[in-house]
C-alpha cells in the first residue's frame, strides 16, 4: 500500500513592493503639530528624524536674522575687547614716548653736591623755586617788549621754598631784599674758597655765584636742607603763559608803572605773557614794595596752576606739548631732579595755590639797612622745626 504523498514545497516568490495607496489627508493635530509623512515607496536616507517633513524650512536659520550664506554672526564682545587693548597699547606707547621726550629736554645744570656744610635732612621734600631775570635767548626786540632792560648776567626776581609733605604742602616766599648772612663758599666754577661777606640782601648771593651759593645761603640762614632746585627766566615764563592761551586774573585796581612796563586796568581779564611778566615783576608803586610783589607772584602762580592742570590742557596734545615744550626748554633744575620730582613739585604748587595748603611770606620783624627786610628769627626757627618734622604749619607772618 503506497505511503502518504510527501509535502510539496512551494517555490518562494519574492513579491515586488506593492504601491502604496493614496495617503489620507491628515487630520488637524492638537497644538498645530504636523505629523511625519510616510515614505513613498523608496528607501529615504533622511527619513526617521523627527525634523523631516514637519514643516520646518532648513537653511533658513532659527528666525534670529542669521546670515543667509551660513556665515557666523560677528562677535561684538571680542571686537570691543580688541579695540580696548589696542587703545591701551597706543596710550602706553605715547606715554613712554612723551616721558623720554620730556626727560631729554630737562636742563639738569645745577650741581648741589658742591654745596658745603649742608644741614641734616628732615622729613618731606624741599624745593627752592627761583624766577631769575635771565635774558637768555631773548632778542633785542624781545627785551624791549618785555621791559627786561639790558643788564648783564642774571639776578633773582623771586624765590620760594616749597615743602611737600604728608601733613600738607607749604609755600614760603623769600623776599629778594631779605637781610641775611652770605656764608663762606667754594666757587662753583673756580673751585676757590671765599670767606663770608656778612649781612646783605638775599639776591646778592645769586649774583655772586649763582644757584649753588643761593642754596647755601638759604640753608645757612634757615637750617632747612634744600632737596631740589628749579629756575625759570623771563623768556620761559612769558612763553608758558602764551602757550596756555593766557591766564585769567582779577586785577584789584589800575596798575601802571614804567620800570616793569605794567599797564592794566581794574577788573577781570586775561593776561598774555608780556602782561603777566610785568605783573609779577612790579614792586615800585606798591605800598608794601617787595612784600606786595611776592603776594602778587603767589596770586599769579595760583591762577596759572589752576588753569594749566585742567582736562582741556592735559588731554589735548595740541595744547599740552607746546606748554611742556615752553616750560622744559627754559627750566633749569638740579642734576638729581627727575620728571616725577618735577611733577610732584607742580602738583604741590597747584594744591597750595588752590587753597589746599599753606601759602605765606617768610615772617618779617622789620626793616634793615639799605631798604632790606629783617626776618623774625623766633618765628623762622619755629617754622623750620615744623617743616623738618613734617608737622602742620602754625606760624603766621
What are these regions (language model features)?
Residues 2-397:
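Non-catalytic, solvent-exposed segments at the cell envelope interface
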Amino acid at each position: 500500500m503506497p505511503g502518504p504523498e510527501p509535502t510539496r514545497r512551494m517555490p518562494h516568490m519574492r513579491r515586488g513592493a506593492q504601491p502604496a495607496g493614496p495617503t489620507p489627508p491628515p487630520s488637524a493635530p492638537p497644538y498645530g503639530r504636523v505629523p511625519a509623512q510616510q515614505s513613498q515607496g523608496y528607501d529615504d536616507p533622511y527619513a526617521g528624524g523627527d525634523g523631516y517633513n514637519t514643516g520646518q524650512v532648513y537653511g533658513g536659520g532659527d528666525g534670529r536674522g542669521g546670515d543667509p550664506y551660513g556665515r557666523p554672526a560677528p562677535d561684538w564682545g571680542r571686537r570691543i575687547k580688541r579695540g580696548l587693548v589696542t587703545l591701551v597699547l597706543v596710550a602706553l606707547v605715547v606715554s613712554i614716548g612723551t616721558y623720554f621726550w620730556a626727560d631729554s629736554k630737562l636742563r639738569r645744570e645745577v650741581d648741589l653736591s658742591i654745596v658745603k656744610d649742608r644741614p641734616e635732612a628732615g622729613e618731606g621734600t624741599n624745593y627752592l623755586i627761583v624766577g631769575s631775570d635771565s635774558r637768555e635767548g631773548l632778542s633785542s626786540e624781545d627785551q624791549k617788549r618785555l621791559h627786561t632792560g639790558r643788564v648783564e648776567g642774571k639776578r633773582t626776581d623771586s624765590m620760594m621754598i616749597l615743602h611737600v609733605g604728608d601733613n600738607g604742602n607749604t609755600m614760603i616766599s623769600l623776599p629778594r631784599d631779605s637781610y641775611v648772612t652770605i656764608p663762606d663758599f667754594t666757587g662753583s666754577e673756580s673751585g676757590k674758597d671765599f670767606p663770608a661777606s656778612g649781612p646783605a640782601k638775599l639776591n646778592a648771593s645769586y649774583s655772586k655765584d649763582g644757584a649753588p651759593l643761593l642754596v647755601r645761603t638759604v640753608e645757612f640762614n634757615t637750617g632747612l636742607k634744600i632737596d631740589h632746585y628749579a629756575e625759570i627766566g623771563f623768556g620761559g615764563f612769558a612763553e608758558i603763559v602764551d602757550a596756555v592761551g593766557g591766564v585769567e586774573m582779577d586785577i584789584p585796581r589800575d596798575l601802571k608803572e614804567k620800570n616793569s612796563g605794567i599797564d592794566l586796568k581794574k577788573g577781570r581779564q586775561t593776561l598774555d605773557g608780556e602782561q603777566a611778566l610785568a605783573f609779577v615783576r612790579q614792586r615800585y608803586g606798591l605800598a608794601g614794595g617787595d612784600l606786595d610783589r611776592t603776594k602778587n607772584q603767589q596770586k599769579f602762580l595760583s591762577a596759572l596752576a589752576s588753569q594749566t592742570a585742567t582736562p582741556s590742557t592735559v588731554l589735548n596734545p595740541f595744547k599740552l606739548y607746546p606748554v611742556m615744550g615752553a616750560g622744559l626748554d627754559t627750566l633749569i633744575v638740579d642734576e638729581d631732579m627727575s620728571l616725577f620730582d618735577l611733577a610732584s613739585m607742580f602738583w604741590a604748587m597747584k594744591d597750595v595755590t588752590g587753597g589746599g595748603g599753606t601759602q605765606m611770606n617768610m615772617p618779617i620783624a622789620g626793616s634793615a639797612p639799605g631798604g632790606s627786610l629783617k626776618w623774625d628769627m623766633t618765628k623762622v626757627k619755629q617754622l623750620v622745626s615744623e617743616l623738618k618734622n613734617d608737622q602742620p604749619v602754625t606760624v603766621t607772618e
